[in-house]
Amino acid sequence: MTDPAKTHTPMMQQYLAIKAEYPDTLVFYRMGDFYEVFFADAEKAARLLDITLTRRGQSGGEPVVMAGVPFHSLEGYLAKLIKLGESVAICEQVGDVATSKGPVERKVVRVVTPGTLTDTELLNDKAESILLAVHQGARNTCGLAWLSVTQGEIHLAHCANDELETWLARVNPSELLYNVDVTPAFEQRLKTQRCAASARPAWQFDGALGARRLLEQLKVASLASWNAEALNEAHAAASALLGYAEHTQGRALPHVQGLQVVRSGELIELPQSTRRNLELTQTLRGEDSPTLFSLLDTCSTGMGSRALKSWLLSPRRDRAQAQARLEAIAHLRSGPQQTLRARLKGCSDVERITARLALRQVRPRELVALRQTLDKLQQQSERAAGESIGLPELLTRIFEDLQPPPGCTELLGRYVLDEPAALIRDGGVINHGCDADLDELRAIQTNCDGFLLELEGRERARTGIANLRVQFNKVHGFYIEVTQGQLDKVPDDYRRRQTLKNAERYITPELKAFEDKALSAQERALAREKWLYEQLLDQLQAFIPALSRLARALASLDALCALAERSLTLNWAAPVFVKEPCIDITQGRHPVVEARLAETGGGSFIANDCSLSGKHRMQVITGPNMGGKSTYMRQVALIVLLASVGSYVPAARCRLGPIDAIHTRIGAADDVANAQSTFMLEMTEAAQILHTATPHSLVLMDEIGRGTSTFDGLALAGGIAAYLHNKTQAFTLFATHYFELTEFPAQHHGAINVHVSAVESGANIVFLHHIEPGPASKSYGIAVAKLAGVPSAVVTHARHALSALETQQTETRAQVDLFAAPPEAAAPVQTALDRALDTIDPDTLSPREALDALYQLKKLSALA
């Protein structure tokens, strides 16, 4: 027989059944005014949220371990869990408590995960929450599919396995899905991205199913217009992506109606090291400011900020988009940007409101904010009706899409109060005059106070009890209260409802009839409001495509206005794109350093020129530490990036040829988490650059070789410089502390020497931060040490030691050509075994053919 003590209670049976469907997710189980978590979930939540862990009663013969959070505080706790990379299933009571036999019916209504956030309280205004799925293909390739649920566009891509880390850095997902059957080596590549990641069942990554899902999602018959029909690995990733996104939202995603296929050759490569070293969106300390993005972002809306960040991190090699933005900015600079920016202020985040509307999660006050924004845009449209002549093409398209969809504003105004309650469950949302039945029910509630006062007056007159009161509370409903001293005057038709210490509370047939009517009206009014709200959401679904277009246009206009404002305020110039290979910058400045100097009163930024061309592709940069070599290199890269985005640049003039990548090897820091030493990281990044850079790439090499011994470092630096000059032929800024490398340009005509100037005054040094032709005469390292506060005895000792070392080097220096090409190795003789290996394609062999080939190779090996 089953021991009753070992069986679970009905409520725990319900919980365990729900938990079984979400084994890897924290389940928040609604019980009254709290969300409870049980057993292992409770222990985990208590640890992560710092909430109390308790044990109450028993179920299945064991104490029930539990913890809970108030329902009205849920969003704050969710935000903390999401930040920690956790996912949470929200389980609500959906049944009627009054009619339920046993536990009230409950079900999971949504799953909140780091990559599928839609709640305003959980999202960063300036950043997307991105869900990425990756599928490993059969031939050393993989497919990627990603989306932001609030943005409404699916992205597909194919890449080689060894390019995966670059793609992960580019997409920067909040959550990553991958096939549980991937190889260990592939899984290790995925773990370079520090985000929430989960292995999903292999059947979810189905290429044919993914293609069908894309067709259904986009409501098209073919993917040919996107040239996306043959991307089988990406289709497999899309299958898992869409299935997971729909599962977390508990419904389809009707607002996701865009598709973009991103191809490797379309974007300018910005590896993770480049994004980090140039401090595009985060400082080297991991802070949001001061960065290039924080300097540029004067957008009036969150969606404008997100669009601007996307532009900054995804510049295209094709110049058409950048040129269109430059033309739009030029027009906005001439006057309209100030007026437009004033009108953009106060606009709501239409993009995220539209997504929440499509998912039926939108709140009443968000609908009011949407209506107010549409009102503002309608007024702007009417004012701009006669100003469209002469607009650049990009602005023309934007203003066309900014038209509010006809009827949407009026519908919102008819249904929703100007100042509604925060949630529909509280009532007070639907406008007066919208629905006659609701108005009638509200009238009953409104007349309640008048009826109670009138009844109180009549009962006082009838009973002679002067202090008699007619009142209401949520526990006991309506009642007539009589004090103890007046109880002898109570009529026979009063029925006792509650006894207090100093009074009795009664109800009469008349008051009971009114109570039934009033309470019924309140419940019916709330139910009616909820029904009307659902009807409104139904009608608004038809406007989602137009609202999505409007949101994209509004975001683009906001971002363009921000770039126009920055160009005027910071005195930036328009770059010029040319076909010949060149980076020609006159009076260039580092935008972030210049802004910081202006803020802190640190003086004026020293502008510098940079000229790289087909004739001179490399600069060997020498000069003192603290002189500004790294700043100069970074500013060149930032100017190239800004121009490629379609922004004005911090320079007097800029001519730019084709660019396909910006690579940086600047500074070094131990990657302890991945067990990489400083020098190993330095060499790894250098190797990646040497393998991937092309003649159209910009390469920044700062102090390469400093992580090892002097001779090793010098030899490696010389070899790397020669490879970049002779083989890669990339535009290269090569800063070094090895003065032997100043001899490099004498033997390599595509390189020139430049140096950062400084002057000495006695034992002191003044940095001029100016780039001048020719090599530096010395490094001034000891002078820098003195500036840093190193004790004078150490400085004096160092000066004597330096003098002795320089004398010794002059006398004994070996005459070694650092830059001579290595002797050519003898051409290897190809053996029969080599030829046999060359003819084998492992991917096409059957098991029997593979075995035969193995025996043949063994035979040839014995003969060799």
UniProtKB/Swiss-Prot annotation:
Keywords: ATP-binding, DNA damage, DNA repair, DNA-binding, Nucleotide-binding. One of its GO terms (biological process) is mismatch repair. InterPro entries: DNA_mismatch_repair_MutS, DNA_mismatch_repair_MutS-lik_N, DNA_mismatch_repair_MutS/MSH, DNA_mismatch_repair_MutS_C, DNA_mismatch_repair_MutS_clamp, DNA_mismatch_repair_MutS_core, DNA_mismatch_repair_MutS_N, DNA_mismatch_repair_MutS_sf. PROSITE patterns: DNA_MISMATCH_REPAIR_2 (PS00486). ATP binds at G623, P624, N625, M626, G627, G628, K629, S630. The keyword Nucleotide-binding applies. GO terms for molecular function: ATP binding; ATP-dependent DNA damage sensor activity; damaged DNA binding; mismatched DNA binding. One of its GO terms (cellular component) is cytosol. HAMAP family: MutS (MF_00096). Belongs to the DNA mismatch repair MutS family. This protein is involved in the repair of mismatches in DNA. It is possible that it carries out the mismatch recognition step. This protein has a weak ATPase activity. NCBIfam families: mutS1 (TIGR01070), PRK05399.1 (NF003810). PANTHER family: DNA MISMATCH REPAIR PROTEIN MSH1, MITOCHONDRIAL (PTHR11361:SF34), DNA MISMATCH REPAIR PROTEIN MUTS FAMILY MEMBER (PTHR11361). This is DNA mismatch repair protein MutS. The lineage of its organism: Bacteria, Pseudomonadati, Pseudomonadota, Betaproteobacteria, Burkholderiales.
